[in-house]
Amino acid sequence: VKQDKSAMTKSFISPDDTRARFSRAMSEMYRTEVPAYGTLLDLVRDVNDRVLAADPALRKQLEETDNLERISEERHGAIRLGKASELQMIARVFGVMGMQPVGYYDLTQANVPVHSTAFRAVDGEGLSRSPFRVFCSLLRTELIKDQGLREKAEELLAARDIFSDPLRSLVEKAEKDGGLSEADARRFITEATKVFQWHSDAAPGVSKELYIQMRDADPRVADIVCFKGPHINHLTPRTLEIDTIQADMPKRGMNAKNVVEGPPGSCPILLRQTSFRALTEKVRFGGEEGEHTARFGEIEQRSAALTPKGRQLYDQLLARVLENVKPKADGSNAAEYNAFLDQTFRAFPADPAGMRREGLAYFQYYVTEKGRKHQGQAPASL
């Protein structure tokens, strides 16, 4: 539901505040369920604090652009849904929090049997209050090749309801009244968070044998179909120095990916990401014990957004890298890959002035402290 912020009264909690609270509730739940994620958050905050202490200019810049307070907050999470009715209802749930679907991603092109969108705030004020977004994928059961498994998957999904009656009632109330009171907002966040919690018991009717068959067909299918609900797949905080995070994760007991994905650190564009590898968790399939591997912790370092011209150059350079050096699964050529990546991206201007001059990136402009001192004064010359 799209809510008019101007219609909000003092008796209602704003959708932006509800989203910010929901993000914190999700973070607390995930820290409890996946202790390694709590360790990751502590590391991110330690690194960000060190970077800001060592770079007063960066701290001042972030203070002026209203970004400092939310540096270490989670930027996004990811979930996987099983049927269209779940997507329809989750859109209403996110709508209460001012989140709208943005973009469409057909992941079948990457041999993943889902298509996806991202739910987030779409205006500057909302993003400033809470940038949290949820990447939401929907299973395409028609792409399950085995007819027997496909029919069983559809049967299991048809039987489940991932939304509680109180949550449905609160969504309907928010849509009807135009918002939620403080008490209702608290109940809403509690019920909404339950949708994404981990269940150590598989869905009714899922045996260990069936789970293995689903997993062998596609791990994503098993992750969606064989559980009672769409447990959060990962959460992603933001760091100011991802290479330090990458180096320090093993020191704190986390099994980090072999390389940081994205452009090299010498080229501050787009997004760089890394994560600790998905954990193996115990699951009960009726009377049998089993395991499931899906959930992990991710980190991102955000830089300049690219124009179409900039994105074209980025894609060309990355394709050149992958044609020559592909990262191996065991990490044995990580140093070679990173060196070739850094060398290749020297063709991309690494400084903001060069990017702006060549029309490669987007920029926002803010009044500096010096400019504010002269606010309201006519220029001496034009």
Predicted regions and their residues:
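Extended, well-ordered protein cores
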Residues: 2-382
